[in-house]
Amino acid sequence: CHIGGNSMGGFVSLRFALDYPERLISMTLFNNAGVVGANESKLQIEAQAGKNPLEIHSPDDVKRMLAFVAHKPMKIPGQFRKIFYEDFAVHRELLDKIFWNLVEDGTGKPLNDQLDQVKAPTLIIWGRHDQLIDVSCVNVLEDGIPNAESVVFEDVGHVPMIENPKG
């Protein structure tokens, strides 16, 4: 199969590549979690201070969170911010638990030393201004995965497929 994922989905893709190498033809990673680069991200610094910068407490926080995720502001109409907030509020406890588990797994149990076991050709796509997972992870991935190449987009944050879909 061909697999790809962004952020946590990229971590799942990478884990799949390690666990089922015989089933994988190729992989695309977009700003994936699961490795530690030379530099800490703004999210890691906030998390070390006990803060979750992705947490939403009001519809206005949706705007702040999206500005943290994307390099250029995303325009989301007020009614959609309200819906986004309401969905987040329903699942706040679970989302917070997932966030802290990812922070722990991403920094406490990184896959850096297993990357050489990835056999599938891998394309690494990253936004230079990712505040969630530092762009220094690109070098770790490209150096660690034997058949990998990377593309780093300028003026893009954590979601290159949304911020620069034609890239």
Where are these regions (language model features)?
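Core-facing hydrophobic residues within beta-strands of well-ordered domains
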Residues: 23-25, 145-148, 156
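Flexible "cap/lid" loop of the alpha/beta hydrolase fold
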Residues: 14-19, 23-58
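Alpha/beta-hydrolase fold nucleophile elbow
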Residues: 1-7
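Conserved alpha/beta-hydrolase catalytic His-Asp/Glu region
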Residues: 38-43, 56-117
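Short beta-strand/loop motif that positions the catalytic acidic residue
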Residues: 118, 124-126, 130
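Catalytic histidine-centered segment of alpha/beta-hydrolase-like enzymes
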Residues: 153-166
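Conserved alpha/beta-hydrolase "acid-adjacent" motif
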Residues: 131-137
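Active-site loop->helix "elbow" adjoining a glycine-rich segment at hydrolase catalytic centers
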Residues: 7-10, 20
